């Protein structure tokens, strides 16, 4: 039941924030700013320093308010570490069937990466709950629309190059949610500690989702 509730939360939010920072303190501040702006689904990538510790801290401090996941999960060892640290979903740039199986075993969401129609179908049939279309900026909204046409039953989450200028186009093209990184959590903004800016951007992305879904 929890897994389905978590999937519904991802789909309702429409935004999965990909968050990176140089310290766990910074990352917690980023997460708080995103939450204040209305984005409550967040992915901590395993490219950040001490990713497991960061996941544990964010889960401890904000786990009851956000849906926390781990990104750049390339193997089962990383997957297990992420799940034990509190991740409720795992995101990958590619498809590793064993990682998907681990998610299913523990009742967590699997969001593997794929790009071609064959890769997307393979990921979904392996048990993906959402397929991350990556790197989506290579083809843009037009490519996502072409994918979605024959595969309307597969939840697609474009990631890579999603910003405020094209977010609406991706949603209209069939995206169930958007994976948003640098255009939402800008590295320079984090370095300056301008978390108000991140809150503002989060609110703008959520406004785009609401507008597209109500028109």
PLM-predicted stretches and their roles:
Residues 1-86, 105, 153, 164-165, ...:
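Conserved N-terminal beta1-alpha1 strand-loop-helix module at the mouth
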Residues 20-22, 48, 68-76, 92-96, ...:
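Glycine-rich beta-to-alpha transition loops that act as phosphate-gripper elements at the mouths
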Residues 38, 62, 86, 94, ...:
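Conserved functional loop/turn residues at catalytic and ligand-binding sites
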Residues 41-44, 90, 132-133, 157:
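Short catalytic-loop micro-motif centered on adjacent basic/acidic residues
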Residues 89, 93-138:
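Histidine/lysine/aspartate-rich catalytic loop segments that bind and position anionic ligands
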Residues 89-99, 133-141, 173-196:
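Glycine-rich phosphate-binding active-site loops on the catalytic face of alpha/beta enzymes
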Residues 118-173:
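A generic hydrophobic-segment detector
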